[in-house]
């Protein structure tokens, strides 16, 4: 059962918007390798605005994800890629439906 989540907003610089999109598209492989991250989405809502929404069974798995390779790669390149620091909001999962 999913109990906690993260909602991360990223605003790319004009000159790096395609690179941010490419990074997020490729990051799914890292997310797939995280056994404690059963739900992970990378979304784009406009030309410059990107989101990561992911959900976890518990706070330990969420923290492991925050300490993992996706966050490390993002933070290592945030100043170069993003127009502002990423907004990382922890959330509680009230309800969920994920099917494939």
Residues covered by each model-derived region:
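Short coil/turn motifs at secondary-structure junctions
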Residues: 13-15, 45, 57-59
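Short hydrophobic/aromatic beta-strand micro-patches
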Residues: 9-11, 53-55
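Intrinsically disordered, low-complexity acidic/polar segments
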Residues: 17-19, 61, 97
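Glycine-rich beta-strand-turn "strand-cap" elements at beta-sheet edges
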Residues: 1-5, 9, 39-48, 73-100
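Short, surface-exposed ligand-recognition loops at beta-strand->loop->(often short) alpha-helix junctions
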Residues: 11-21
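An amphipathic, aromatic/His-enriched active-site/gating alpha helix that lines ligand/cofactor pockets
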Residues: 26-39, 55-89
């Amino acid at each position: 059962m999913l109990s906690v989540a993260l909602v991360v907003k990223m605003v790319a610089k004009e000159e790096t918007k395609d690179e941010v999109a490419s990074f997020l598209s490729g990051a799914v492989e890292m997310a797939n390798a995280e056994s404690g991250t059963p739900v992970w989405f990378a979304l784009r809502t406009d030309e410059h605005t990107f989101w990561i929404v992911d959900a976890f069974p518990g706070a330990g798995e969420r923290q492991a994800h925050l300490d993992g390779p996706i966050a490390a790669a993002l933070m290592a390149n945030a100043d170069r890629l993003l127009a502002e620091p990423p907004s990382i909001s922890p959330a509680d999962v009230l309800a969920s439906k994920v099917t494939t």
